[in-house]
Amino acid sequence: MEQKIRQNGNAEFSMTISTSRELWRYLFRGQKNSSEKLTRVEAFHDLIERQYAALQQENDCIFGSISSLSRAWHWDRDTTSAFITDLEKFGAVSRYDIGKRAVLKLNCTIG
């Protein structure tokens, strides 16, 4: 476990929590978003579902575009792109582009 020391002298730890698709489905059960615009948590859950669907079709990756994700989440392209970039920084997704198409892969353990 990585330990960092804050300015006030208290230790700050980096923590990684493994979750499952079933846990995410449980957490969202009964939740209704009052607007069409998804929250970041809902968008991440959507990526989990897209990754699961891709794996069922024997694909390792989610194929699409920032525009298609923007439309699905009711976000603008800049916000969507920044969100994916942030997820990359956290190590949650890997991304590469083929032309205008984004290829995303959740960094997950399959079992």
Residue ranges of model-derived segments:
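Winged helix-turn-helix DNA-binding recognition segment
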Residues: 51-111
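Short recognition helix of helix-turn-helix/winged-helix DNA-binding domains
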Residues: 1-68
